[in-house]
Amino acid sequence: MIQKVGIIGSGISGLSSYYYLRNGINLTSKFSKNNLKINIFEKSNKVGGNIQTRIIQGKNKDEKIIVEEGPRSLRALGRGLNTLEFIKRLGISNDIIFSSANSNGKFVLLDGKPKEIPMTSLFDIIKFSFKHSIVSSILKEPFKKVPSQVKEMDPNWDESVHDFFSRRLGKTMTKTFIEPTILGIYGGDYTNLSIKSTFKRAALLEPFGGLILGSLFKSKKQKQFELDLDKNEKRLLPSKNELTELFDKDTDKTNVFSFKENGLSRMIQKLKSLIESDSLTKLYLSTSIVEIEKDVTNGTLKVTDNKGNQYQYDQLISTIPLNQLAPMFKKSDSKLYQLLQSVNYTSIAVINLIYKSNKNVVKIISDKGFGYLVPSKENQSVIGVCFDSNTFPEFVNNNNNNNNDNDNGNEKDQSIITVMIGGNNGIKDRNDNWIDVTNTSKDKLLDIALKHLDKVLDIESSPDFTNVSIYDNGIPHYNIGHQNLINEIQNHITKNYGTTLLLGGNSIDGVGINDSIHKSKQLINSLKLSNN
């Protein structure tokens, strides 16, 4: 019987694991876990992991500007439905705001300037396709040869995102549109990123024919296969009908959301307050785990922290990056240590810029959607630029009286721009201006960001506020064969630890916040605790 649980990490994965442990995995749970003792360990002095929101005073004393130093928004699609349900259960759904329609535009930097990718008008799509020489790629795609391993659905088959889409769509379309998408999500090197771990659905559906035109003419077999895929993916997900009142807020139908007061940190703050009011849960800040070993007498796990304290747990859940978990098994399990070290990560720098009284900047970015992504072929040091004040105007028009009237003029001369630099070091093989952010000073990174905005957007003004955050090994990089590696890790754990040790976080299956919360739900469900 599980009586004492340890959780390593207090990012959204660790905090959501705590929540599901204490409250059950669904809305109808009447969880009686009052006897379950939970300890949460965090090596830093604050919770939240990569979710860190900063509040900056606006141009007036009663205004505040919301700046996201890490992830900037959530999507209410797929696993995002589970996140919306999670937010509803936390009791903070009234704080949700959906993004503005002004951020709907999708842009890519081409020939040194942001170019919009048409999404609505068929004529514009055709015109754009001819201009960028991708029409033939789309027309030929259904007739591309499928490798024998794919036809046979070999479970061990994997290839890079680059090779998959180059084979299906051609090199021009792949390097122009697929690669910047990968940079925006993973900061990844698409020549070594696993197709099965990033575009799993596309990889699984390839044996049935074309991914684009072919999807319009599905065979009965393909339709059934997709139904089975959807059924498996939607397990543990609520239906959209259960969340109608939240989707009614999305008047612009953007599916992108955050929180009006404190950005994404609103979730973190709420979860932290629940932990602080829970007498059977203890949060250890500035405490790292240095060793984990199995107690052969009873199968529990013995944990030692950096202060020499020892703990014993019936259940241990790790939500930290696997390469950070690895050293904890160096003495007790050399095989697991080696396996965990084999998972790769990417470093990225996020540069936040605020312009408080600058109508020119507002004018420059107002028609450029959420921002733009930068293909490596552009040979830029920057991999993406986000116009956060386009996405959430409330973030620059947020005063202490909660007066968010867009007609008061407060937001019209204030802007938030976020610049991303870095990514996986494999990018340097095709981009001479790639920057190793872990070996570059923050001042230099800021200078690169400002010079980029000057060159590309003609923004010469100095920002009123700047912040540079470097996430060293901050994003998992799912290399080719990633899923086989994860399976090997899981098999080793099952054989040697049973279900006493569970792995969560974003190193397994999906790097986003939605993925992390959903993974926590899956883990707690796997424990088969009563009233789940």
From Swiss-Prot:
<dbReference type="GO" id="GO:0006782">
    <property type="term" value="P:protoporphyrinogen IX biosynthetic process"/>
</dbReference>
<keyword id="KW-0350">Heme biosynthesis</keyword>
<feature type="binding site">
    <location>
        <begin position="9"/>
        <end position="14"/>
    </location>
    <ligand>
        <name>FAD</name>
    </ligand>
</feature>
<dbReference type="InterPro" id="IPR050464">
    <property type="entry name" value="Zeta_carotene_desat/Oxidored"/>
</dbReference>
<dbReference type="GO" id="GO:0006783">
    <property type="term" value="P:heme biosynthetic process"/>
</dbReference>
<dbReference type="Pfam" id="PF01593">
    <property type="entry name" value="Amino_oxidase"/>
</dbReference>
<dbReference type="GO" id="GO:0048870">
    <property type="term" value="P:cell motility"/>
</dbReference>
<comment type="function">
    <text>Catalyzes the 6-electron oxidation of protoporphyrinogen-IX to form protoporphyrin-IX.</text>
</comment>
<dbReference type="InterPro" id="IPR004572">
    <property type="entry name" value="Protoporphyrinogen_oxidase"/>
</dbReference>
<keyword id="KW-0627">Porphyrin biosynthesis</keyword>
<dbReference type="GO" id="GO:0005743">
    <property type="term" value="C:mitochondrial inner membrane"/>
</dbReference>
<keyword id="KW-0274">FAD</keyword>
<dbReference type="InterPro" id="IPR002937">
    <property type="entry name" value="Amino_oxidase"/>
</dbReference>
<comment type="similarity">
    <text>Belongs to the protoporphyrinogen/coproporphyrinogen oxidase family. Protoporphyrinogen oxidase subfamily.</text>
</comment>
<keyword id="KW-0496">Mitochondrion</keyword>
<dbReference type="InterPro" id="IPR036188">
    <property type="entry name" value="FAD/NAD-bd_sf"/>
</dbReference>
<dbReference type="GO" id="GO:0004729">
    <property type="term" value="F:oxygen-dependent protoporphyrinogen oxidase activity"/>
</dbReference>
<protein>
    <recommendedName>
        <fullName>Protoporphyrinogen oxidase</fullName>
        <ecNumber>1.3.3.4</ecNumber>
    </recommendedName>
</protein>
<keyword id="KW-0560">Oxidoreductase</keyword>
<feature type="binding site">
    <location>
        <begin position="511"/>
        <end position="513"/>
    </location>
    <ligand>
        <name>FAD</name>
    </ligand>
</feature>
<feature type="binding site">
    <location>
        <position position="289"/>
    </location>
    <ligand>
        <name>FAD</name>
    </ligand>
</feature>
<keyword id="KW-0285">Flavoprotein</keyword>
<comment type="pathway">
    <text>Porphyrin-containing compound metabolism; protoporphyrin-IX biosynthesis; protoporphyrin-IX from protoporphyrinogen-IX: step 1/1.</text>
</comment>
